[in-house]
Amino acid sequence: MDSQVTSSAKTPNPVVFFDITLGGESLGRIKMELFTSITPRTAENFRQFCTGESKSPQGRPQGYKNSKFHRVIKDFMIQGGDFVNGDGTGSRTIYGTPRFQDENFILKHDQPGLLSMANSGPNTNGCQFFITTTATPFLNNKHVVFGQVVEGMDVVRMIENTRTTRDKPNQDVTIIQCGEM
């Protein structure tokens, strides 16, 4: 996969991972590079939800561990990250607000394997994200690209090809473990 961003040797971009199951069976690991030099706030929000560093208002770790991919559309994208409600309606940030502003639209949705923020309109970024499975130029200037899959695109393809009903996977697609490499 061609990289839109090359990390410098001095400050390499962080790499995070998801270990995924489908219906309780292991699918494997997805590793993602976060573009901290271009989208520092967006990348840090995602990174902390991968590591569990972020705490809920009750002081408990919050993040992607044990959350599900709730929306899967073949030849488009796989969407997850709603650890609040699990259905695409929840939003949380590490910044103490339910949402944060679009950081920028420098990077484009021009290839499969891009990590981008799901939202419900301008400046409504939270915890939800999606991974593209094809180029999606119609999302440019609407969703913030902040990373890319560097390993495990085969796992993304397995998720993309799982059976769905109204774009919801028929079996749970779960992030059973996540963190930073």
From Swiss-Prot:
> What CDD domains does the database record attribute to this sequence?
cyclophilin_ABH_like
The primary site where this protein sits is nucleus
Q: Under the cellular component aspect of Gene Ontology, which terms does the record hold?
A: cytoplasm; nucleus
Which stretches are annotated as coiled coil? Answer: none
What compartments host this protein? Nucleus
Show the Gene3D superfamilies listed in the entry. Cyclophilin-like (2.40.100.10)
User: Tell me, what is an example of a GO biological process annotation in this record?
Assistant: protein folding
Q: Which GO terms describe its molecular function?
A: cyclosporin A binding; peptidyl-prolyl cis-trans isomerase activity
The PPIase cyclophilin-type domain covers 17-180
> Hey, which family's this protein in?
Belongs to the cyclophilin-type PPIase family. PPIase H subfamily.
Purpose of the protein: PPIases accelerate the folding of proteins. It catalyzes the cis-trans isomerization of proline imidic peptide bonds in oligopeptides.
Spell out the protein name for this chain: Peptidyl-prolyl cis-trans isomerase H
